């Protein structure tokens, strides 16, 4: 099974890349953690933001193969504790499909992406910076795996 983070935005600071890669390499091979970056359209003063969101959503969905699970990260999604995330991770693992965790751009996800979502997850009611979200997702996936495997990291 693969866990794939599909996120709008690229050219992250080095600390973000290092943080993401640190948690990705800690994951066992049977739960590979991957990152797919979707280029962010340049927002100018008179930008057609709705068109940009739609284009970014199309690019995100183009990375998803038929039958794969889509989980959107949304402020109004369901908040999961670490233990609840571990339960979800175990369900995903038993389902054996690739899980695509979708993170939109500054204005959020395209409605088409949300419509395809099987689950909606909220990391926090706070607005979080996109670079930090990547590391947070990586760390939480690793932490959930340690709960399932009895690894002492979570304690």
Swiss-Prot record:
Signal peptide range in chain numbering: none
| Listed Gene3D superfamilies | 3.40.1280.10
Q: E.C. number, please? A: 2.1.1.177
Any Gene Ontology CC annotation: cytoplasm
Query: Which SUPFAM superfamilies does the record cross-reference, listed alphabetically?
Result: alpha/beta knot (SSF75217)
What Pfam families does the annotation carry? SPOUT_MTase
Reactions catalysed = pseudouridine(1915) in 23S rRNA + S-adenosyl-L-methionine = N(3)-methylpseudouridine(1915) in 23S rRNA + S-adenosyl-L-homocysteine + H(+)
Molecular function in Gene Ontology = rRNA (pseudouridine-N3-)-methyltransferase activity
Q: Which UniProt keywords apply?
A: Cytoplasm, Methyltransferase, rRNA processing, S-adenosyl-L-methionine, Transferase
Q: Where in the cell is it found?
A: Cytoplasm
The keyword DNA-binding is assigned to this record? no
The residues that the entry says bind S-adenosyl-L-methionine are 73, 104, 123-128
Q: Which family does it belong to?
A: Belongs to the RNA methyltransferase RlmH family.
| Entry function | Specifically methylates the pseudouridine at position 1915 (m3Psi1915) in 23S rRNA.
The annotated subunit structure for this chain is: Homodimer.
Under what name is this protein listed?
Answer: Ribosomal RNA large subunit methyltransferase H
Q: Give the species.
A: Pseudomonas savastanoi pv. phaseolicola (strain 1448A / Race 6)
């Amino acid at each position: 099974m693969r866990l794939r983070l599909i996120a709008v935005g690229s050219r992250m600071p080095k600390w973000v890349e290092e943080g993401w890669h640190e948690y990705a390499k800690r994951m066992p091979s049977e739960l590979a953690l991957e990152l797919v970056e979707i280029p962010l359209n340049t927002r100018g003063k008179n930008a057609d933001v709705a068109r940009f969101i739609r284009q970014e959503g199309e690019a995100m969905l183009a990375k998803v193969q038929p039958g794969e699970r889509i989980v959107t990260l949304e402020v109004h999604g369901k908040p999961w504790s670490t233990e609840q995330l571990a339960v979800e991770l175990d369900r995903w693992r038993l389902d054996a499909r690739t899980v695509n965790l979708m993170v939109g751009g500054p204005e959020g996800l395209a409605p088409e992406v949300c419509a395809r979502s099987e689950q909606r997850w909220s990391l926090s009611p706070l607005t979080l910076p996109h670079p930090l979200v990547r590391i947070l997702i990586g760390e939480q996936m690793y932490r959930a795996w340690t709960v399932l495997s009895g690894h002492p990291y979570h304690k």
